[in-house]
Amino acid sequence: ELAALVTPRTKLICLNNPNNPTGALMERPLLERIVRIARDAGSWILCDGVYRFLVHDPKVRVPSVADLYERGVVTGSLSKCFSLAGLRIGWAVGPEAFIGDLFSHRDYTTISCGRLDDRLGCLALEHRETILGRNLALLRRCASVLERWVDSEPRVSMVKPRAGTTAFLHYDHHLDSQTFCRRLYDRDRTLLVPGTCFDRDRWLRVGYAFAPDDLETGLGRVSGFLRQL
């Protein structure tokens, strides 16, 4: 399908890997196919890789598009994998000339980050194995909680997420997803993101990166809401 859409006029192919909201993961064979399509068209690839270090299976290693393709650019940040969204620090990896141009453009938007933010970011990277290990252990526990809940709900289904902190749930009811989420919040003060935000009605995005007990409580409220529909 991508090959049919890309033409010599295609300047940029944007990827999100691992994917938000589904938690899907594109591994090397698929990425290499996308690179071939981009190279044939002379297109760049921009890959949002903010969840790259939160692959649930430790045996899976996903290459960077910047390593696979001479016109590949990958962005990342401390906000998701390191749970440090408040620092507003990230990075981009790509061809040297492109990164040089990026520095010039960046000077017009962000001259520098705060000294404290910079120091905290450095500390996080110095201790990345500890932080990522803790976060991955939590995610695996929470993913199991979510999977058990989906198995127990006959009107809910999902493709099991392989990475990241979100999953995309399909529900079997005529109620549109925006109304579903508004009513759920009004009734139970529980937040889900409507699938219409991702052009998919009757789907819901759930974030599961927090205390397992709290996740179970929230999912229980969704069950109660489903029962009264």
Task: Give, region by region, the residue ranges found by the protein language model.
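Active-site pre-lysine segment of PLP-dependent enzymes
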Residues: 1-9, 21-44, 49-84, 97
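PLP-dependent enzyme catalytic core of the Aspartate aminotransferase-like
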Residues: 3, 174-175, 182-192, 198-229
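Hydrophobic residues in well-ordered beta-strands that form the structural core
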Residues: 14-15, 45-47, 76, 192-194
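Helix C-cap/helix->beta junction micro-motif
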Residues: 40-41, 153, 188, 229
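Conserved core segment of the aminotransferase class I/II
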Residues: 68-140, 147-149, 220
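A short linear hydrophobic-aromatic micro-motif
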Residues: 74, 154-158, 190-195
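Short hydrophobic/aromatic beta-strand micro-patches
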Residues: 93, 168-170, 207-209
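Conserved glycine-rich beta-strand-loop-beta hairpin in the small C-terminal domain of fold type I
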Residues: 122, 138-147, 158-171
